[in-house]
Amino acid sequence: MHMPKNIKVKPHKLEGVYIGNNKFLLTKNLVKGQKVYTERIFKSKGEEYREWIPFRSKLASAIKKGLKTWPFKKGTIVLYLGIASGTTASHISDIIGEEGIIFGVEFAPRVLRELMFVAKKRKNIVPILADANQPETYQHIVVQSDVIYQDVAQPHQVEIFLKNLRFFAKPNAIGFLAVKARSIDVTKDPKVIFREVERKLREAKLQLLESIRLDPYHKDHMMFVVKVPKAW
């Protein structure tokens, strides 16, 4: 591996996120010398940073689009539904550190195998082969979580999200729901679909904190951020 390039790094206003050369997002690499996907690795003042590419991560694109709600810090407990091969999760792993934990639910065995390689080095990621629509099948593994993050391309993704919040959300937990309009209904205008998602979240008595369109990074996607009320 070639030597990481030295760059100028400053903290972003969101905890655990950094900005490189006033341009790109970074997280401090929890496992030095290790890449997870095609990200570049940089050095600054003896620390190693990984580039967080918004075109590869919906959470990074939400940050680029002005996300304000940020529950991730050292020690945060995260349930990640639809973790895939761990691109976004690896950056959350950098931020929450060894004191935190990510329970990563993934339905596709082939993809989960890729995640296993990431989790081997990153002890704060727990891969779970399961269907996010059946939280009862993994309730013996997952603990009550500070954050529930969902990126599941299913028509009934809102229902899956609500079900998991009911099972695993601590009071005042924050939920992130990344919605791809076309996976709900190809025939409908994305705006109509997003309004429908918002209505369902409000009907469930969740506090809607933010809704952010993820264009141009992810076409026809929106990130919804909710807070679970204390007595829900």
Curated annotation (Swiss-Prot):
SMART domains (UniProt xref): Fibrillarin
Class of this enzyme: transferase
Enzyme Commission code(s) on record: 2.1.1.-
InterPro entries: Fibrillarin, Fibrillarin_CS, SAM-dependent_MTases_sf
Pfam families documented for this protein: Fibrillarin
Keyword Lipoprotein: no
Gene3D superfamilies: Phosphorylase Kinase, domain 1, Vaccinia Virus protein VP39
One GO process term, biological-process aspect: box C/D sno(s)RNA 3'-end processing
Transmembrane segments: none
Keyword Transferase part of the UniProt annotation: yes
Leader peptide range in chain numbering: none
Gene Ontology molecular function: histone H2AQ104 methyltransferase activity; RNA binding; rRNA methyltransferase activity
Binding residues for S-adenosyl-L-methionine: 87-88, 106-107, 131-132, 151-154
Quaternary context: Interacts with nop5. Component of box C/D small ribonucleoprotein (sRNP) particles that contain rpl7ae, FlpA and nop5, plus a guide RNA.
Stated role: Involved in pre-rRNA and tRNA processing. Utilizes the methyl donor S-adenosyl-L-methionine to catalyze the site-specific 2'-hydroxyl methylation of ribose moieties in rRNA and tRNA. Site specificity is provided by a guide RNA that base pairs with the substrate. Methylation occurs at a characteristic distance from the sequence involved in base pairing with the guide RNA.
Family to which this protein belongs: Belongs to the methyltransferase superfamily. Fibrillarin family.
Alphabetical list of PANTHER family matching this protein: FIBRILLARIN, RRNA 2-O-METHYLTRANSFERASE FIBRILLARIN
Stated name of the protein: Fibrillarin-like rRNA/tRNA 2'-O-methyltransferase
